[in-house]
């Protein structure tokens, strides 16, 4: 299949090329990873764990274990402020975020989720962490965050990343500890993982809402001269390419009165509108 797809690079994907979203989501909940296979264990790269439920490398047990490990890590580091959490448009991101919320709420972690029930680009979540920590009164517990995204990975993949109080990707000391602890929890059959039902987690006193979009878009003039862009009459075309920024571009144009057109606001977890690449 990959050889065939490589020969068709640059052409529109055929129905048989697209990931089966139903099978992907079923596997997320139904498949238990084989920890004897290194490819099915938790392994962090670029601050996060990535994989596919269809390959037994990104399934609910992974997310439950990683989230519990993050809870324990932030406790060891004295990080007791709110944890911002956001997700992208990959099919596995929403169920993974929900799994994480069940663990975070069970552990009494104050969590802030998107007030619009939408998608959160990584820069918007990083900005929320930095803004909170910068504006907090001295002695206020610091915030951190989780971004549920595999970034540029294929539609069948999921990703789960931890951002400490500096807002950027966690370093290897942090991710190494989190991965090791997560694998220990998996090996112990998830004993030690605290969890409550999703509805209880969403309605917990410790679960709140945060407007990531407004916070990010309204702060753009602090780093960009949007007056100069507007006064120059620049015409901007923005293609979110099915990513988490899909709702941000229109708001940027409207709130800052820019001549900006969103040319493709489609969100499709199969990315059927994309042409094939040579490698997958």
Description of each model-found segment:
Residues 33-51, 69, 73, 77-78, ...:
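N-terminal glycine-rich anion-binding loops that anchor highly charged ligand groups
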């Amino acid at each position: 299949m990959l050889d065939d797809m490589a020969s068709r690079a640059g052409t529109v994907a055929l129905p048989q090329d697209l990931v089966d979203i139903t099978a992907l989501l079923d596997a997320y909940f139904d498949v238990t990873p084989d920890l004897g296979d290194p490819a099915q264990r938790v392994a962090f790269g670029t601050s996060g764990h990535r994989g596919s439920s269809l390959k037994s490398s990104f399934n609910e047990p992974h997310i439950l274990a990683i989230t519990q490990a993050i809870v324990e890590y932030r406790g060891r580091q004295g990080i007791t402020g709110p944890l911002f959490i956001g997700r992208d448009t990959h099919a596995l991101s929403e169920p993974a975020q929900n799994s994480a919320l069940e663990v975070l709420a069970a552990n009494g972690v104050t969590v802030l989720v998107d007030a619009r029930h939408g998608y959160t680009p990584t820069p918007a979540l990083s900005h929320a962490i930095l803004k909170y920590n910068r504006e907090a009164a001295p002695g206020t517990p610091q915030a951190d965050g989780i971004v549920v995204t595999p970034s540029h990975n294929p539609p069948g993949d999921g990703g789960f990343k931890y951002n400490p109080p500096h807002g950027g990707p966690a370093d290897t000391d942090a991710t190494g500890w989190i991965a090791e602890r997560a694998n220990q929890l998996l090996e112990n059959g998830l004993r030690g993982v605290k969890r409550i039902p999703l509805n209880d987690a969403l309605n917990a006193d410790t679960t709140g809402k945060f407007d990531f979009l407004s916070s990010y878009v309204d702060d753009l003039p602090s780093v960009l001269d949007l007056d100069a862009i507007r006064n120059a009459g620049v015409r901007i075309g923005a293609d979110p390419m099915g990513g988490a920024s899909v709702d941000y571009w229109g708001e940027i144009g409207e709130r800052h009165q820019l001549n900006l057109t969103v040319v493709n606001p489609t969100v499709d977890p199969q990315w059927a509108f994309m042409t094939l690449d040579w490698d997958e």
